[in-house]
Regions:
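Conserved functional hotspots at enzyme active or ligand-binding sites that engage polyanionic ligands
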Residues: 1-108
């Protein structure tokens, strides 16, 4: 769990423990992008994340980008709310211009 560090911010990427899961939910500890707004992240013990993978089917709801020098897809179809205790370690940030419009289209 990430503790004693700066507040969690939208656009940051963390290693997140997603287990246990059910059915086709994405499993294991993997990178995930924080998509929840900063006011929510500061006020609540939970954040909304979208897992990141280097595999999987290319879909319009899965923006493709490069993260830490590797091709990646943000799985906006697998968004979930997780307790901050599931956040293992901060990995970096992803510019919102690479994913935010797709998120708005999905939710709009």
């Amino acid at each position: 769990m990430v503790s004693g560090l700066a507040p969690v911010k939208r656009g940051e990427v963390y290693w997140v423990n997603l287990d246990p899961t059910i059915g086709t939910e994405i499993k294991k500890t993997r990178p995930a992008l924080v998509v929840s707004p900063d006011d929510m992240n500061a006020a609540l013990p939970r954040v909304i994340v979208a897992p990141i993978t280097s595999k999987g089917q290319a879909l319009g709801c899965r923006p493709e980008l490069v993260f830490n020098g590797q091709p990646a897809r943000v799985l906006l179809d697998q968004i979930r709310c997780v307790d901050k205790a599931r956040l293992v370690k901060k990995m970096g940030d992803i510019d919102p211009t690479l994913w935010h419009d797709t998120l708005l289209q999905m939710l709009g």
